[in-house]
Amino acid sequence: MFGRVFIVAVLYCITICKGEDPTNSSTPKLILLSFDGFRADYLTRFPMPNLQEFMKEGVEVEEVKNVFITKTFPNHYSLVTGLYAESHGIVANRMYDADTKQVFHMNDSHSKWWDEATPIWLTNQKQGHRSGCAMWPGSDVSIHNTTPSDFLYYNHTVSFAQRVNHITTWLTRPNDSINFAAIYWEEPDASGHRYGPDDYGNMSGVLKEVDKNVGYLMSELKKANLWDTVNVIITSDHGMAQCSNDRIIKLNDCIGPGNYTLVDDNPVASILPISDTKNVYDLLRNCHPHMKVYMKEEIPDRWHYKHNSRIQPLLLVADEGWMITQNESISMLGDHGYDNDLHSMHPFLAAHGPAFRKSYKMRTINNVDVYPMMCLILGITGQPNNGTLSNTKCLLANQWCIQVSEAIGIVIGAIMVLTTLTCIIIMLKKKMPSARPFSRLQFQDDDDPLIG
């Protein structure tokens, strides 16, 4: 009897040490939700009561540094693979593969474009679980000949509520429920392009609807008794910069259209030269003061954007707020794709659930860091990736962590304490009376004199 009790006690302790709830032995569940084009500072510029409530009970990352180029498809694939664009192969929303001579558009469902990486929904399934995706870019493609266990083909007319309802149904099925879900929603990106992020009047209405969607998700999870057991991550792919019809760079003003093919444009243009590459480069290099031109091999290393055959020989990058076209005007007032160091390009991240701390705020992480964190939450072994788990450990409830600022504070504090103690010791030594010279030769009362 004592032996059985001892074994049960040991197993209980092991469960506690692993950071699991001993009253809930079910597989950890996780929802990843992306609101396309949700710029980080929207959180401080617009009222969002539901999202604020969500973060108050969970964690917030004020800015997420995304991957270059700061476009929809590259960043959504980075979130679910933990890879830079050059590594996962979805380098733009429009691509040309020099090896196969084929062109990719956003509605292309051929798996060859996606097979350079393995998204988390497939890794989760390969390790004995089930995944469900509602419109997440690439989730309706048979990647490595496999689709999510449950998924919806992309259809922009399907409402946010319908997408959430599918997910909650998949999560609560009695026998074959999913444990990982990914949801994509097109706003506020579509309206950000139309109005620009600085149009407070129009964008406030758009973001009010986005916040209502957050409230709907919270409500449905509570109705399904999932709120306290499911982990939810809300984030985005990129931000948005204010643009203008007065800030347009027309390439045909600098070079004849017969000299090149424009693979992708606005505000980062991929150029496939038809004539001599060096000649095209020289013509474009001095085209406009608000546009930088790079040979492929000269693309800055910090962008991790040169080691893939789908990246073209020339890359044109506009300054923030400027747009690149061949010859036409552009009606939209907001855009993204710019340098990923720009704050206007950064999204945010918020998370809630048993895996996360309560009321905790962090300044920044990289979006490739989200993947290893999700793998840890799900209890699966991830694929090789560019993310760093230690960057997100402070967000997690069962992980010990110390931020750089805290570490610096501890070091400075220790130095101050040691310095103070050293000064005190030196001062005390100075105050102590020193022995008189030759005191050892002084006669005591009972000493005999040397001379009688």
Swiss-Prot record:
Positions annotated with a glycan in the UniProt record: N24, N107, N155, N175, N202, N259, N327, N386
Cytoplasmic topological domain residue ranges: 429-452
Record: residues binding Zn(2+) 1: D36, T72, D237, H238
Record-level GO cellular component terms: plasma membrane
Single GO MF descriptor: bis(5'-adenosyl)-triphosphatase activity
Binding, substrate: N93, Y154, D189
The protein's required cofactors: Zn(2+)
Disulfide bonds: C254-C287, C394-C401
Ranges of the Extracellular topological domain: 20-407
Keywords: Blood coagulation, Cell membrane, Disulfide bond, Glycoprotein, Hemostasis, Hydrolase, Membrane, Metal-binding, Signal, Transmembrane, Transmembrane helix, Zinc
Enzyme Commission number(s) from the entry: 3.6.1.29
Similarity section: Belongs to the nucleotide pyrophosphatase/phosphodiesterase family.
Its job: Hydrolyzes extracellular Ap3A into AMP and ADP, and Ap4A into AMP and ATP. Ap3A and Ap4A are diadenosine polyphosphates thought to induce proliferation of vascular smooth muscle cells. Acts as a procoagulant, mediating platelet aggregation at the site of nascent thrombus via release of ADP from Ap3A and activation of ADP receptors.
Protein's name in the database: Bis(5'-adenosyl)-triphosphatase enpp4
Lineage: Eukaryota, Metazoa, Chordata, Craniata, Vertebrata
